[in-house]
Amino acid sequence: MRSKRFEALAKRPVNQDGFVKEWIEEGFIAMESPNDPKPSIKIVNGAVTELDGKPVSEFDLIDHFIARYGINLNRAEEVMAMDSVKLANMLCDPNVKRSEIVPLTTAMTPAKIVEVVSHMNVVEMMMAMQKMRARRTPSQQAHVTNVKDNPVQIAADAAEGAWRGFDEQETTVAVARYAPFNAIALLVGSQVGRPGVLTQCSLEEATELKLGMLGHTCYAETISVYGTEPVFTDGDDTPWSKGFLASSYASRGLKMRFTSGSGSEVQMGYAEGKSMLYLEARCIYITKAAGVQGLQNGSVSCIGVPSAVPSGIRAVLAENLICSSLDLECASSNDQTFTHSDMRRTARLLMQFLPGTDFISSGYSAVPNYDNMFAGSNEDAEDFDDYNVIQRDLKVDGGLRPVREEDVIAIRNKAARALQAVFAGMGLPPITDEEVEAATYAHGSKDMPERNIVEDIKFAQEIINKNRNGLEVVKALAQGGFTDVAQDMLNIQKAKLTGDYLHTSAIIVGDGQVLSAVNDVNDYAGPATGYRLQGERWEEIKNIPGALDPNEID
């Protein structure tokens, strides 16, 4: 006979999750593997001759790249000789300024910085993250996708997402050739919701770069780097080729960051027996060495791997902290779904939500998860109210805000009509009034009429083949009567010329003002310092629609 309590527990959502015991030899260990190298560095005549116990004769491509470009050698020997526990204390001590820490962390080797953060528990890591994030003001990023690649729905959802507070929005495709329509719809909708929101379309790298050069996206993120050489070469890549791609984006005025995440090497079968965090540290150093301003990390689409082993979610926070400690923008994941448990996914979110990161999620699904083409997110559109209440409960700025239904309906309708004008002006397959009406009130693709997919794909490919650029979109908006949106779209193109939003951790706010680590420096130094939720922003977060006004109660 079974215990009734254990029968009840067996039915709990968390017991549908996958867990595995540590398997050190294959890399199924989140942190502190006995196979991780001991920190070391030797420098002869300004060149690294030993890195983390490995002589230069045994360096792989990643070692060479990091040794040449990724470490501040001027202070490396000094910092490597410092006690790691002392360095860990300095990281989480608010009395030690970020400006004092960065010269130390950027002079460490990957094994050294992993050793440092391994001395910290999650509360200490959150204390450190609050101080070490690059931009003073935390922010949020959204996923905006649907299973039908319906551009009208993407535009409406993007407008709502921007209205709710997302500063970056990302789409991808179910069908690769739909990409130009998705990119245009996302950018148009985002500018309707709030001018200045940055957008991207995650694709195969050549197409993604092409769309950026045509002016249909504002940034790129899914340029992946890995912590072992076989995973790199399996994808016909090297750290140098990724660095070249990064410079291609930057030279066109497009913001970009790399992507990596613990567990990717295990998933690809090339972990070389090292811990997930150590291999991820190598990815972060590759990013720094390539001169890229930021990184999306936090396991991202590999979250099922670290979350299955002990201390895995702690390791995810640790990799975010290492990223910020190397003075990089950190888009800290809270991305792909990994658990059936609401309690567990909230605990995972709080690691980044409470201290704040440059982008707490990368991204939060602004659509219901059944429409999320990034395989679902840790938070989706059905969590908006919960998220806003948690911000209010804890007085934490998580990047979003409460909204009114009538405002959302209006903004969705305007976005759908604006895209209708773009398609008409550019001679693309027409968007019907029925589609506009459906997108105005839709929750997801189940609420949308079908489009002629064959026609859409044909014309979408013409965008690429005929080099139809963002200025054509601006012209179509102006001719269609949406002069305000046309101006906002033009301003986004101008931003690529000025280049201000290429600075570390940049977002565009207000009337085109760029906030970045340059002019919004994180000055946290303990209580009453750094970013504080106050004034109009706190009033906005407090004012949730469900709150009763005592003055209006009879």
From Swiss-Prot:
The propanediol dehydratase enzyme is a heterotrimeric complex composed of a large (PduC), a medium (PduD) and a small (PduE) subunit. GO terms for biological process: propanediol catabolic process. It is an enzyme of class 4 (lyase). Its EC number is 4.2.1.28. Pathway: Polyol metabolism; 1,2-propanediol degradation. GO terms for molecular function: cobalamin binding; propanediol dehydratase activity. It is found in: Bacterial microcompartment. Its cofactor is adenosylcob(III)alamin. It comes from Salmonella typhimurium (strain LT2 / SGSC1412 / ATCC 700720). This is Propanediol dehydratase large subunit.
